[in-house]
């Protein structure tokens, strides 16, 4: 299991990239953490180190893994989960942009109106989910070399 962080500017140009070392879950961890293991791995072992490694402070951190919302306590910026959805699944309390719905961490729900214009600007410049493909490709490249 790996994690990656790519900070892009409004045009989608990369400003900063980090990735974690591979994580290997032991049987003891599976037993001890039980149902909380995935939240722990994503929030503490992957998301936490990535957010702590950043040099620049983004307006918000987008993630395509909802479990990474649990990393919120490790960074100064709001953490927002993005997922593709159809028009029937959209919830009013989230930010809807085209086929995407953005859900801030509960700690950042009060900032939703402040975040909306930033995401609207970003989505007019790039396809919101595309940077996640670049993260995965960069991690794959690093693993193969």
Where are these regions (language model features)?
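Structural motif
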Residues: 59-61
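Flexible, charged surface loops at secondary-structure boundaries
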Residues: 52-57, 74
